Amino acid sequence: MNKIRKGDEVIVIAGRDKGKRGTVSLRKDDSHVLVDGINLVKKHTKPNPLKGTTGGIVEKSMPIHQSNVAIFNAATGKADRVGIKLLADGKKVRVFKSSGDEIKAA
């Protein structure tokens, strides 16, 4: 079970974007996530008339390692850790470590 999923609001805890918040839009693999507006890089693209693209400099979000982000707890307004709790019916749910509240599925 992944502790950070698509649709979660996360806060960057390390790197040049430290302190910024965003929403996970994609899990690249088991260890990287793509967060909207975080880790922006400038890509230089050539014009391609066959595809209808113009050349220039494009800003694009790149994946960031999941160890550099933490889930954002709206109740406390801070970053929080994620724990896994086993319910009586055998289902696993994600919970905030600080409060024990269940994390709503996005």
Curated annotation (Swiss-Prot):
Superkingdom is: Bacteria
| Classification via PROSITE patterns | RIBOSOMAL_L24
Give the record's keywords alphabetically. Answer: Ribonucleoprotein, Ribosomal protein, RNA-binding, rRNA-binding
In its UniProt record, a GO molecular function of this protein is: structural constituent of ribosome
Q: What Gene Ontology terms describe where this protein resides (cellular component)?
A: ribonucleoprotein complex; ribosome
Please tell me whether the keyword Ribosomal protein is annotated for this protein: yes
Complex and partners: Part of the 50S ribosomal subunit.
Q: Which family does it belong to?
A: Belongs to the universal ribosomal protein uL24 family.
What role does this protein play? Answer: One of two assembly initiator proteins, it binds directly to the 5'-end of the 23S rRNA, where it nucleates assembly of the 50S subunit. One of the proteins that surrounds the polypeptide exit tunnel on the outside of the subunit.
Instruction: Tell me the HAMAP family matching this sequence.
Output: Ribosomal_uL24_B (MF_01326_B)
Report the protein name in the record.
Large ribosomal subunit protein uL24
Organism of origin:
Polaromonas sp. (strain JS666 / ATCC BAA-500)
Gene from which this protein is expressed: rplX
